[in-house]
Amino acid sequence: MEYAPEFDNSYARQLSGFYTRLQPTPLKGARLLYHSKPLAQELGLDAHWFTEPKTAVWAGEALLPGMEPLAQVYSGHQFGMWAGQLGDGRGILLGEQRLNDGRYMDWHLKGAGLTPYSRMGDGRAVLRSVIREFLASEALHHLGIPTSRALTIVTSDHPIYREQTERGAMLLRVAESHIRFGHFEHFYYRQQPKQVQQLADYVIARHWPQWVGHQECYRLWFTDVVERTARLMAHWQTVGFAHGVMNTDNMSILGITMDYGPFGFLDDYVPGYICNHSDHQGRYAYDNQPAVALWNLHRLGHALSGLMSADQLQLALEAYEPALMVAYGEQMRAKLGFLERDSQDNDLLTGLLSLMIKEGRDYTRTFRLLSEVEVHSAQSPLRDDFIDRAAFDDWYRRYRSRLQQESIDDDQRQQSMKAANPKYILRNYLAQQAITQAEKDDIQPLQRLHQALQQPFTDQPEFDDLAALPPDWGKHLEISCSS
């Protein structure tokens, strides 16, 4: 007997006034282009769910029993300014799938048509942006970074007008929750404190049930949100990921990555890297992300000020920097091959990063090559990458000396370092190549890239071309917010 997912929509049942009910608006000539087999397996969906009769679900043409589609309302700060009411302008929450382990997963259809919150938009998504989000969310997941996931890509013959005419598409996004900082801001700025508390109680009962009824449940919950967000920033910084649009309406209350737009991974190590060509002031530059996340948490704290005292809010927010520094320190030590802490570790890290800045070295390649270092060999696989050999040799001498303090052998250390230093990341030019071919109905590059990204830390000789340094044109792609 075929497995039938069990759906609910607690958001619809428990949070009246927080959404608008509506049906998805199908695209003309919609067809399933691609899906994530690993995610499908996690959701209990076999191959039959991705054959022609079932395509209607992924294309917004049919609903499964228990689904109650709705668009959520929220507000937010965008580029540091209060933007007022926003909401799901082109996405519809179809329902929540109950998994065998008791968890619930939102099914959210992006590009599903106009909603009351579309503002000046058309409610649609283009194939280009759908493929980028699919690949990015799958890439971050396999890098071990908390993120929403992407299950299906639907393409169509429906023309969508952006800077040029593009194909309309839909993405089925999966996450434990789509609640954002901006949900709380919306009701706070509308002077609806009961709704703020109602939403907080819903989130705590759903995702932090251990604190229901606790005298300080709101402080404990907010502190965990702060710490989760801090750890997420540490993950982003260590892999060289820039989100690009860290508005409060794009910040998850669960501390996961969501709302992929003009994101980018570092090629050359440029701390001030700006991936969004609309970010003229560099607010969301790579090296500014941890500070912006804290600013956003302060905005969330302000929205929650009716639930906690000022001292409780401050105490929760003060957990951010220690959580960030601990997580970042642990992850960067792992990238350097250090199991134990040492007073010289930070100098060695900043020394290497300074060399990379000075010579424009590739972030991912440098750390991956570092994983091949042999402690007792004066020859480094990295040396030929640097022009200033004297400066590198001085750093490398100190680095080898530090490695000799570790209690594991080369093989063990190299394996642990490779598990912290990916070989394959989603470079913008690789995503663009996959998009270009998919727009011609050739999904082989998309499929191949997706396959490589599922094992980013493993040497896969058949995908060596996907680990190569980008061509010059590939380093300077400007990514638009239009999607």
Swiss-Prot record:
Catalytic-site annotation from UniProt: 249
EC number: 2.7.7.-, 2.7.7.108
Residues spanning the signal sequence: none
Superkingdom: Bacteria
Record InterPro entries: SelO (IPR003846)
Named cofactor requirement(s): Mg(2+); Mn(2+)
Keywords of the record: ATP-binding, Magnesium, Manganese, Metal-binding, Nucleotide-binding, Nucleotidyltransferase, Transferase
Membrane-spanning residues: none
Keyword Manganese carried by entry: yes
Residue sites binding Mg(2+) per the record: 250, 259
UniProt catalytic activity: L-seryl-[protein] + ATP = 3-O-(5'-adenylyl)-L-seryl-[protein] + diphosphate; L-threonyl-[protein] + ATP = 3-O-(5'-adenylyl)-L-threonyl-[protein] + diphosphate; L-tyrosyl-[protein] + ATP = O-(5'-adenylyl)-L-tyrosyl-[protein] + diphosphate; L-histidyl-[protein] + UTP = N(tele)-(5'-uridylyl)-L-histidyl-[protein] + diphosphate
Chain sites annotated for binding ATP: 87, 89-90, 110, 122-123, 173, 180, 259
GO molecular function: AMPylase activity; ATP binding; magnesium ion binding
Function: Nucleotidyltransferase involved in the post-translational modification of proteins. It can catalyze the addition of adenosine monophosphate (AMP) or uridine monophosphate (UMP) to a protein, resulting in modifications known as AMPylation and UMPylation.
UniProt family annotation: Belongs to the SELO family.
UniProt protein name: Protein nucleotidyltransferase YdiU
Naturally occurring in which organism (per UniProt): Yersinia pseudotuberculosis serotype O:1b (strain IP 31758)
The encoding gene: ydiU
